[in-house]
């Protein structure tokens, strides 16, 4: 899709949203067509690094013990230790709250079997299974990447909605993020953006602004 048309849609989305007493998020909505999404190879399951960043921090949880847990704690991340992990396996309500409150999960590799057993049923359907890392990993580069990343997982749905930033970001920054996501969609399919029936940008409390094809 043409960069100018994406930018125009971002600008229009702003005009369609009334000012609120909170900073509204901006989303890209994409409606796919002529794809058999019961076939796994046609589904979109991607982590996309946004060129303009997310504009705000995303909550990250680290499932770890020992030095890795201490490193995560020093970075101000949510830390889930082994004993807490075992408890979460018994308390689905709390597990769901943690899953919904965090955008990404990182897990010490040797704890992954326990993660799968305890949190897998909650994280798996949300597309949030942890990124495994060794016990001596430096978390900083991975955390920095996740702070600029959004995840898409269409499963068998033809429509997906994904965060591209918030209203305090410039139109150009938001448009660049939207374009990066559409480029991933284009590269996924042999016919590229032909499979995009329609696309929109939208603020939290505003109407959707169509991106002209």
From Swiss-Prot:
It holds the Pfam family Ribosomal_L1. Disulfide bonds: none annotated. GO terms for molecular function: rRNA binding; structural constituent of ribosome; tRNA binding. Keywords: Repressor, Ribonucleoprotein, Ribosomal protein, RNA-binding, rRNA-binding, Translation regulation, tRNA-binding. One of its GO terms (biological process) is regulation of translation. InterPro entries: Ribosomal_uL1, Ribosomal_uL1-like, Ribosomal_uL1/biogenesis, Ribosomal_uL1_3-a/b-sand, Ribosomal_uL1_arc, Ribosomal_uL1_CS. Signal peptide: none annotated. The keyword Repressor applies. GO terms for cellular component: large ribosomal subunit. Part of the 50S ribosomal subunit. Binds directly to 23S rRNA. Probably involved in E site tRNA release. Belongs to the universal ribosomal protein uL1 family. This is Large ribosomal subunit protein uL1. It comes from Methanococcus maripaludis (strain C7 / ATCC BAA-1331). The gene is rpl1.
């Amino acid at each position: 899709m043409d960069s100018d048309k994406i930018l125009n849609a971002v600008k229009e989305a702003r005009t369609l949203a009334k000012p609120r007493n909170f900073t509204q998020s901006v989303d890209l909505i994409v409606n796919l067509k002529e794809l058999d999404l019961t076939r796994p190879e046609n589904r979109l399951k991607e982590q996309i690094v946004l060129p303009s960043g997310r504009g705000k921090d995303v909550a990250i949880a680290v499932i770890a013990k020992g030095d890795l847990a201490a490193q995560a704690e020093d970075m101000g991340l949510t830390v889930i230790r082994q004993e807490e992990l075992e408890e979460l396996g018994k308390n689905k309500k709390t597990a769901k709250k943690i899953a919904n409150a965090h955008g990404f999960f990182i897990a010490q590799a040797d704890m992954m079997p326990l993660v799968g057993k305890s949190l897998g049923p909650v994280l798996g359907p949300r597309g949030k299974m942890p990124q495994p890392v060794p016990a001596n990993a430096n978390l900083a580069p991975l955390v920095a990447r996740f702070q600029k990343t959004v995840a898409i997982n269409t499963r068998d749905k033809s429509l997906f909605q994904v965060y591209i930033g918030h209203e305090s970001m410039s139109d150009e920054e938001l448009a660049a993020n939207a374009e990066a996501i559409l480029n991933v969609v284009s590269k996924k399919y042999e016919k590229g953006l032909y499979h995009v029936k329609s696309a929109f940008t939208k603020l939290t409390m505003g109407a959707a602004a169509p991106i002209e094809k």
